[in-house]
Design a protein with these regions (language model features):
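FAD-binding subdomain of flavoenzyme oxidoreductases
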Residues: 119, 126-282
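Anion-binding (especially nucleotide phosphate/pyrophosphate-binding) glycine-rich loop
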Residues: 83-98, 103-145
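Short, conserved secondary-structure transition motifs
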Residues: 143-150, 302-318, 424-430, 524-537
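Conserved glycine-rich FAD pyrophosphate-binding loop
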Residues: 33-41, 64, 69-71, 76-88, ...
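General beta-strand structural signal in soluble alpha/beta enzymes
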Residues: 19-23, 45-46, 66-70, 77, ...
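N-terminal flexible segment immediately upstream of the FAD-binding catalytic core
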Residues: 1-61, 74-110, 261, 308-317, ...
Length: 563
């Protein structure tokens, strides 16, 4: 099948409205959120999973590459082309029109189709007294449920571990190049692909069709695993073979039509403790006690260094206000609006580069102070900050421990009221985008960002990084923050103009190798990191012809994995 014949077939399947070939209009699908860009023959937006299957059939017949893409919010370019050096044309299948979520088993599980988002799932479950796997961070900017599963995404919630399921419906191309539909959802939906996909889309199945022993719907072992604080290995990271299972961790090497996931009861009684210290050993003691000794695991434990606090204070202020005013559920629309403004700005010669960021930063100067006095006082007194959230019996447990511990140590804590709780959580969220804003506003002095996503050994007591001067003097600002209980850190470095960011990153990664760290921890390899041998092997097993998302993890982009 020629390229023109393929385009004709795809148009017949989805209609002219939902196939895009104009490079100017496909840019938002071909370009990653932070990283990655390349050409594509077409972007196709199916409205049903049966259309998605027909698109894939045509692409296999035409021998083209297929990149399945949902929200395209990944930070490492994992759902876009990267460069133009593939040996076949690329078709991007964007799944966001297929956003159906079905609750099953008394709301204790959900079946999510490819376009469903974490944000949407959270809203659906809230009145039912349930929660999804993730309720912070990526859920706020529109990330998809399936994107999280396919990339073993982590998150702030200690008790739930990385996104994981053993129940999925997916398409695979076998070694002979034949397309197969595999139903491991544990739901009897019929025999043919057409029956299975149509019945699932329309929720044409009953309770008796649902198997209760079809597999795990989340990582059951993580609660005990994270408690092993003396183990010389990381708690969670993307290349961990223990969390690779078909769709889970597949990174687009399968086309996934649906996943079945567990939901979780809402934590009724919670409290947030804001902890400050100038001694990293004190935070280490708290982490080891909370994980190794507390009866109740923390809900979350988020670390912020003073310098990250300061950058977010200035460059995340408007983000803070927007979420406080409109709520996280409006953020996807606002991010989409921002992207539209930026695309318009590129076409208008007199507007500055990064127009929307510079405009919002200017406006933020006139906003009133947004942080409570208690947090500002701790910023002045203490270098290291920990936001510890506990639930149920863990509230009294943590309160008693912290009171006794700080009676004879140099740091301090306070229990947050409602306003302080909201401010602490929003400020932590604002840190994540502050470095990007800084880069956009100061593009005349910043070369670029180096953003590392790392998992330290669970027994690593010397967790705070000290860079050698030859690296440190090339950096304007360092932002350290992360999921402290899991020992997962996000480290954003704003690099001075004129330096080689890739070379600097390699030097930093070499230092992390010496410390026994793993990377990436939760953003997956995308086209930014090299996949470890076990991960490469997993990808080859899933996709022996290398037809899905080739080049991921710096692997071969050629058919049948040719070098």
């Amino acid at each position: 099948m020629s390229a023109s014949q393929l385009l004709s077939s795809l148009t017949q399947t989805v209609g002219e409205k939902y196939i895009i070939t104009d490079p100017a209009k496909t840019e938002q699908y071909r370009q990653g959120y932070r990283f990655g860009e390349g050409k594509a023959l077409a972007v196709v937006r199916p409205g049903s999973i049966l259309e998605m299957w027909k698109i894939l059939q045509a692409c296999v017949e035409a021998d083209v590459i297929v990149i399945t893409q949902a929200a395209n919010t990944g930070l490492t370019g994992g759902s876009t082309p990267d460069g133009n050096d593939c040996d076949r044309d690329i078709v991007i299948v964007n799944t966001m029109r297929m956003n159906i979520i079905q609750t099953i088993n008394n709301n204790e599980q959900v079946v999510c189709l490819p376009g469903s988002t974490l944000n949407q799932l959270e809203l659906l479950l809230k009145p039912l007294g349930r929660e999804p796997h993730s309720v912070i961070g990526s859920s706020c900017i529109g990330a998809s449920v399936l994107g999280g599963v396919c990339n073993n995404s982590g998150g702030a919630l200690v008790q739930r571990g990385p996104a994981y399921t053993e129940m999925a419906l997916f398409a695979q191309i076998n070694e002979e190049g034949r397309l197969e539909l595999v139903n491991h959802l544990g739901i009897d939906l019929g025999d043919t692909p057409e029956e299975i996909l149509t019945n699932l889309q329309g929720h044409h199945y009953q309770k008796k069709d649902i198997k209760q022993d079809a597999g795990k719907g989340h990582d059951h072992a993580y609660c005990e695993h994270v408690r092993q604080v003396d183990e010389p290995t990381a708690a969670r990271f993307n290349a961990d073979p223990a969390r690779h299972y078909e769709a889970s961790g597949c990174a687009g090497k399968l086309m996934v039509f649906a996943v079945r996931l567990d939901t979780f009861p809402q934590e009724k009684q919670t409290a947030v403790f804001y902890i400050g210290t100038n001694d990293i050993n004190e935070l280490t003691d708290i982490r080891r006690a909370a994980l190794g000794e507390f009866e109740s695991l923390p809900v979350s434990g988020e670390y912020i260094h003073r310098h990250a606090f300061d950058i977010a204070d200035v460059y995340g202020k408007d983000t803070f206000y927007v979420i406080k005013k409109f709520g996280t559920h409006q953020l996807p629309k606002l991010f989409d609006l921002k992207a539209r403004v930026d695309r318009f700005g590129k076409k208008v010669s007199f507007l500055p580069k990064h127009f929307s960021d510079k405009a919002m930063q200017f406006v933020s100067k006139f906003l009133p102070d947004h942080l409570p006095k208690s947090m500002r006082d701790y910023r002045d007194k203490y270098e290291h900050h920990l936001i510890l959230k506990m639930g149920g019996k863990g509230v009294d447990e943590a309160r008693a421990f912290l009171k006794e511990y700080f009676s004879h140590h140099g740091g301090a804590f306070f229990e947050c009221n409602a306003e302080e709780t909201q401010a602490a959580m929003l400020h932590r969220f604002a840190v994540a985008s502050a470095a990007i804003r800084y880069r956009s506003v100061h593009d005349d002095e910043v070369e670029d960002l180096v953003a590392l996503d790392i998992a330290l050994r669970r027994d690593d007591r010397d967790w705070f990084e000290k860079l050698p001067p030859e690296i440190d003097n090339k950096i304007i600002h360092k932002l350290y923050y992360g999921h402290f209980m899991c020992h997962v850190f996000h480290q954003d470095y704003i690099i001075k103009k004129g330096n080689d960011c890739m070379a600097l990153e390699h030097e930093m990664l070499h230092l992390l190798d010496q410390r026994g760290a793993q990377y990436p921890a939760e953003h997956n390899v995308g086209h930014l990191y090299e996949a470890k041998p076990a991960l490469k092997q997993f990808y080859r097993k899933l996709d022996p012809t290398n037809s899905f998302n080739p080049g991921i993890g710096k692997t071969s982009k050629k058919k049948n994995w040719a070098e």
